[in-house]
Amino acid sequence: MQVTSMIIDDFYVNPDSVRNFALSQPFDKKGNFPGARTAAYFTDDIKAAIEHYMPWAGKITNTYEMSGFTGAFQIATAQDRTWIHSDPHNMWAGVCYLTPDAPHSGGTGLFRHKETKEHFGHHNEYDGYDYTKWDLFDIIGNKYNRLVIYRGDLYHASLDYFGNNLENGRLFQTFFFDTEKR
């Protein structure tokens, strides 16, 4: 059986210190994503921890350092909007939720295109803003210090952004990487 997504609760040993570190960083990176991001922050310890939870996939072989997004912290608030998409340029994508007491509904949704029945895509030609064209087949709730890893080509979207500032908005850390095996 092939793994398409996995949930790791209590990922960081000290999530409060990770959150405090994230909040001290400048959120000055804008791009094709809601909200704003920091510079990448992907240490050898983080890499080893992810590899520990994915022994069947082998070592992490590429973290797309040139993109500056692997390990970046991101903030999005209730005013931000997202769309259904995939991240097909990498084998794996992930988010670690870093807002304590966040609404459970502010997690990640996994989608299937209604017309084609596709869960995975190496393109984003479908209208990701038109949620009526998609079936939501799984919801992964937002829980403090939960790491969610899923295949990069799996259609997904953030759900229910919340808050209005850095302290109470949806703070998370992004990951994009390849491994020796899928």
Model regions and ranges:
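Non-heme Fe(II)/2-oxoglutarate
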Residues: M1-I84, G107-T108
